[in-house]
Amino acid sequence: MTILTQSTTWQALAAHSHQIPHMRELFAGDPARFSNMSLSTCGLFLDYSKNRATPETLNLLQTLAQEAKLDAKIKAMFAGDIINTTEKRAVLHTALRSTAEQSIVAEGQDIVPEVQQTLNKMQQFVTSVTSGQWKGFTGKAITDIVSIGIGGSFLGPKIVSQALRPYWITGLNCHFVANVDGTSISEKLKLLDPETTLFIMSSKSFGTQETLTNTLTAKAWFLAKGGSQSDVAKHFVAVTSNVAKATDFGIDADNIFPMWDWVGGRYSLWSAIGLPIALLIGMDNFRSLLKGAHQMDTHFANAPLAENMPVIMGLFSLWYGNFFNAQSHVVLTYDHYLRGLPAYFQQLDMESNGKSVTLNGTHVDYSTGPVIWGGEGTNGQHAYHQLLHQGNALIPADFIMPLQSHNPIGEHHDQLASNCFGQTQALMQGRTLDEALAELSKSSLSDEEKLLIAKHKVMPGNKPSNTLLMDKLTPETLGALIALYEHRTFVQGAIWDINSFDQWGVELGKSLGNDVLARIGAEQDATALDASSNGLINLYRQGKI
């Protein structure tokens, strides 16, 4: 057993998990449960009353966090300590949304001035492009942006841009390319005019396979459509640490934006990786996005554990994963603009906490990162909600909804809200056999048929959920929401004693993929790998089954 599972608090939680009454009873016995188990901060309201929890549960979970030295680990992250121990790096995405007055030291120097310089450089660039001052090789202003990245360099900008569609004020169009599948970029290029298109290449090394391949394809298209090598600088910019490779490609050094080792890809949208966002919503709105995230940072760093929104959400996720064998967690966004958030949170959580050894290399004997999935309401109610209500797996849920719509048409939003709240009630309350029989009492079915149908209509309830509300979806509230989930992810990793900031599984896939690519291009059939891999490579080389 690990130190964590040997602790008396862990053992107490394991025993306590079998003693909690059904949530129906918890609500019936405590009229103040909603007010006692809800919290408002940074423009967000969290109702966590529909969880399998009593005051004793919360006390035990907070004790577990204290024993794991969560407070000290939070301070260490904000202080710039080397908490990404396997890569010997600080973790300071929070510095990207710091204020100019702060001082944050990494690798012996204050990094805030460089962050502010980059924001100012982004401001100048955005103004140049959106004002029409930036011209393409034929003298025309830019109309379309193509953002080329992968992972965090793709998901963050794409999903935030999608979420903030009501704030697109610059008149530009933006297209996102990530997958190395040639169809992805080909379909985008068909829509574009090379004279008015600007490409943003985002890769720390300027060598990420998918990103470099897509960028080279974009350059070849540009040259084939009338551009010259000397014109590349007018149509390509880069966010990278490798200035030499970017300039060799043809990008002007003045149009290269920095990336830092103390920012992981899945936490990078707050940096120059967010250029596509800024080009669509303007820098004032981009700074509001940063402001909302900074407010959540301040809350996370200073609020007591019992009143700390990311801590509460992180502890409940751990509670269900480790003591109720919950293998997945669903995120349900009741706002069309937020439909991409489940995919973003999926990468954030699963790439961070999909680990199986502790910081000292001991194999864990408890579950770590769950599968994160989800979609937008009300679509999911006609698909996978059936599994949530009557399936035999426990799947905790987060419901996210703005109280006010950007498009208040008729009763649309009232119906959306009623569905959202109705689903959380149904998951908690369920339907008993007696209730199902009562609903069938006036039907013409026989008693035997009524009983049979009633059994099929029973729903156990007691399915946990959080509900997150905001007044309205704005850059500021979105920034706070994303930072909330970043810190929620950190809380779990800190208690599990794992490194939430490396991704060696991703790195292995990259290296093996490169090896397979070499074998695909070889003159002779593959024979050196396992039989399955050899067979698949050789079938691919033949081009037919």
UniProtKB/Swiss-Prot annotation:
It catalyses: alpha-D-glucose 6-phosphate = beta-D-fructose 6-phosphate. Keywords: Cytoplasm, Gluconeogenesis, Glycolysis, Isomerase. GO terms for biological process: gluconeogenesis; glucose 6-phosphate metabolic process; glycolytic process. One of its GO terms (cellular component) is cytosol. It is found in: Cytoplasm. Pfam families: PGI. One of its GO terms (molecular function) is carbohydrate derivative binding. InterPro entries: G6P_Isomerase, G6P_Isomerase_C, Phosphoglucose_isomerase_CS, SIS_dom_sf, SIS_PGI_1, SIS_PGI_2. It comes from the Bacteria. Pathway: Carbohydrate biosynthesis; gluconeogenesis; Carbohydrate degradation; glycolysis; D-glyceraldehyde 3-phosphate and glycerone phosphate from D-glucose: step 2/4. The active site is at E351 (proton donor), H382, K510. Its EC number is 5.3.1.9. Catalyzes the reversible isomerization of glucose-6-phosphate to fructose-6-phosphate. Belongs to the GPI family. This is Glucose-6-phosphate isomerase. The lineage of its organism: Bacteria, Pseudomonadati, Pseudomonadota, Gammaproteobacteria, Alteromonadales.
